[in-house]
Each structure stands twice: as C-alpha cells, then as structure tokens.
C-alpha cells in the first residue's frame, strides 16, 4: 500500500495551478449519458474517482477518449447498450449513484449497485430514490442494487427536499431534463458545482433556471445534443492551498480559480489574521510570517462554510493562537482526523458534533492513517509543518480528490515523497 513520507518544518510559498473541480466533473460526466451526440469536456482533473467514472461509462457502452491535451475528454453516449453500473466499479465511489437518473430519464431503465466511498457517516440514497419515484419511476432494491424503471418518459413534479442535498439535487435535475413537463425542486442545493452542471446541461439544450438558488425549475425537453464545456476550478483544492500558506507562515497564489465560490472560507482566513488579495482568476494568501488566530467554524450548505474544508481548518485551529470550536452539521463521524492530529501533539477533544481545539505552537512528526479524502490532506499538511518525519498511510483517499498533490506541494517547497511498503 502506498504512503507519503513528509519531512516537516517547511514554509510553503509560491504559485499553484488549481485543477478542475472533482465535485463538478463527476456529475457532468454522468450527465453526458443524457446526450445523443458527442460532448467535449476540458479542465477535467486526473483523479481516481474520475478514472472510476470513465470505467463505469465505458461499461455502459459510452465511448470515452482522453485527448493528448491534459484535461480534455471526448464523451460519446450515442451507443449505450448496457444499463447496469456493477458493484465491482461502484463499490469505491458514492458518486456512482448519479448514473441512475440519466439512464432512467433517457432509456427508461437503470440499475446501480449501492455505492461506497469515504466512510464519513450516513449518506443514504433515499432522497435520490424518493425524487425519482415522485416523477413516476418504479424503484426496487434487490441484492444490493437499486433498480429503476418507468413506462415512457418521467413526469415533471414539484419536489421538496427535506434536507439540502447536493447529490439528490443533481440526480433530480438530470432526471428532469428529459421528463415530460415541468419539475420544480424546492430547498435545492446551491453549490457552485450544481450551477456548473446546470450550465453544462443547458449548453446541450436543457431548460434549467434558478440553479444557485434554493428553487430550481426544469422544463423537460425531448432530446439533448452535444456541447463543449469547461469544468469550473476546484474551490476545495483552492481553500486547501490557502490553508497550507496560513499554517506554514508562507505565501501562496492559487492561479486559475474564482474567489466568489469561496467567500465563507476567505472570510474565516481573514478573521484568522491572513492577508488575502484577489484578482479575476487568482487568490493570494500571505501569512506575513504570523501564526494564525483561532476561528470558530460551523459547517453549512453553500453559501455557508463547506464541510469539505472542515478538516483543513481543524488543522489550522490546532496550531493557531487561542481556543476554537468547530461544529460539523453536514456529516456525522467526520472528525476521524482529530485522533491522528493528537498523535502529532495537537490538543483537542470531541463533544458530539463539535470539536474544541486548543492551539499549540508546534506539532511533531508521527505515523498517521488517512480515513477519508479531506482528513488525509489535513494530515499531509500537518506533516509539512511538524518537526521531524511524518508517514501518512492509506493515501489512496488523497488520489481520489487531489490531482498530482505531491508534485504541487513540492513546487511550494514541501519535502514529500510517495513510497510503497
């Protein structure tokens, strides 16, 4: 199994190019199933989850071609001949549930194995299923598979989301694009990745309005054509590198990114005493060589503070001046990085869905284990600033969501290497 060896006490400084957003690339790749003509995508990140999605699409009969130009992918779903996303591919990635709605909407049937992915608590597919049922689908759970069928086209419906869910919002949008009549999603997720997926679908001929608000309307059309689309920059990768500068006394410019998708994170970094400069396509954080100040965090759906930045800010708070509280309202069981940080000398305790962090001046290198994608990057960054050597185990989690992470960190001055047992 591959691991990272990180030599600490690095001040991370320089410029880093931000990749396309995984959380936009995955739904957009699955949404390409809806198109009868080829689609060209650019700025697609080279990640394990993207690779898994390619495999699922190919299994369905989609032609997926990666161009020589990095990040450019041609998708042709004109000859889909299979309607089952099998367990051996789906088991590693929860996002594979997004194959169901486009298969059902275009071909009136689909089967997806119940998915896997990060072990950060309950992420049930119930909201995906109930939304499809309201549009006329017949759903059954059989031997670990979600099987969906519909006689003719799905029917537009008014769907209220009991809980804000990015995944379910995207599933219903995909289903509604080819449905008969109008679908209205109330209490919809507002994340930038939902907006990007809607822009992509509209470029293919869908009629979606309201994406980015809590009420999204979709007027069904009979077919979708091809298009060309560029995936939005990864706001979570951007935030991760900004935190890297803040905790290491460094200065990092994130290039090819957008500040308007990261306002809650930028506000908290400024509250922590960091100097931030913004241009149209870059964000620079200068720590001015100062230790960050502790900041209280409460994760919320967009435009609130993103849960995918919680682990990175936990790290910031355990090395900050002062005491802070971090409350996780989105996912249960998402503090598994804290016991690992404690092994490195952090002082923190967990009370229910809240972590209390008492800032210390220094962390010490240790052997630690990654438990999920965002927790794993916080441990790597902790290793960059700790004294001595840190070994991070189970780094396959990082490869699911961060493109060329060790190469990018080395470009900023980190001393990090990948090795196998």
From Swiss-Prot:
The gene is murA. Belongs to the EPSP synthase family. MurA subfamily. GO terms for molecular function: UDP-N-acetylglucosamine 1-carboxyvinyltransferase activity. It catalyses: phosphoenolpyruvate + UDP-N-acetyl-alpha-D-glucosamine = UDP-N-acetyl-3-O-(1-carboxyvinyl)-alpha-D-glucosamine + phosphate. It comes from the Bacteria. Its EC number is 2.5.1.7. Cell wall formation. Adds enolpyruvyl to UDP-N-acetylglucosamine. PANTHER family: UDP-N-ACETYLGLUCOSAMINE 1-CARBOXYVINYLTRANSFERASE (PTHR43783:SF1). InterPro entries: Enolpyruvate_Tfrase_dom (IPR001986), Enolpyruvate_Tfrase_sf (IPR036968), MurA_subfamily (IPR050068), RNA3'P_cycl/enolpyr_Trfase_a/b (IPR013792), UDP_GlcNAc_COvinyl_MurA (IPR005750). CDD domains: UdpNAET (cd01555). One of its GO terms (biological process) is regulation of cell shape. Pathway: Cell wall biogenesis; peptidoglycan biosynthesis. UDP-N-acetyl-alpha-D-glucosamine binds at residues 94, 163-166, 308, 330. Phosphoenolpyruvate binds at residues 22-23. It is found in: Cytoplasm. The active site is at residue 118. Gene3D superfamilies: Enolpyruvate transferase domain. Keywords: Cell cycle, Cell division, Cell shape, Cell wall biogenesis/degradation, Cytoplasm, Peptidoglycan synthesis, Pyruvate, Transferase. GO terms for cellular component: cytoplasm. This is UDP-N-acetylglucosamine 1-carboxyvinyltransferase. It holds the Pfam family EPSP_synthase. The keyword Cell membrane does not apply. Coiled coil: none annotated. The modification 2-(S-cysteinyl)pyruvic acid O-phosphothioketal is found at residue 118.
